[in-house]
């Protein structure tokens, strides 16, 4: 593998399917699809000369993938540093896989659970914290609990980011808005890092900035 990475990171969408319907997540017109293990292996082989840092997320819920273990093993064998973003509804179910093939960082979108009335919050929080404790105890995985400050007021912790304990963090951000060519908002300043610092590969193999 090339020691000098061209991209800081590459996003690889292993599935476009999700088990939640969040109001803040832009609906896709693409058909639900799961990238096969062979397709994923090909992706890793082809991007290996450009980066060693991947995010298993664009749209969709990565923990839904039925062959997640095989995918993480491919990453491990290729010496890829892996981050994944999840709503964590399946984290207890997928815990054995995450223990067998630990990733560098798991980003948990807590606002996803808060946005779906179908979720039993008591069970969700219990399973999440129990799984986090196990991962923190048995692996070096870092866990970032992400919240959106929709009220735009000083947050409870007094800071946007804080460390709860070793490898466990809380990250507070403003709500993310997906780019929309039909939006009436136009910023006069800005710069797109797409194809400069990162790129993404969708589950059907399409490459996007």
Feature map (PLM): residue ranges:
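Well-ordered, non-membrane alpha-helical segments in soluble/globular domains
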Residues: 120-134
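Accessory C-terminal segments flanking Radical SAM cores
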Residues: 11, 166-209
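Structural recognition of alpha->loop->beta junctions
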Residues: 44, 48-49, 94-115, 157-175
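Active-site beta-loop-alpha junctions enriched in small/polar residues
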Residues: 59-61, 87-89, 111-113, 148-150, ...
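Conserved strand-turn element in the central/C-terminal portion of the radical SAM core barrel
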Residues: 113-115, 131-161
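Conserved alpha-helical substructure of the radical SAM core
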Residues: 1-105, 117-119
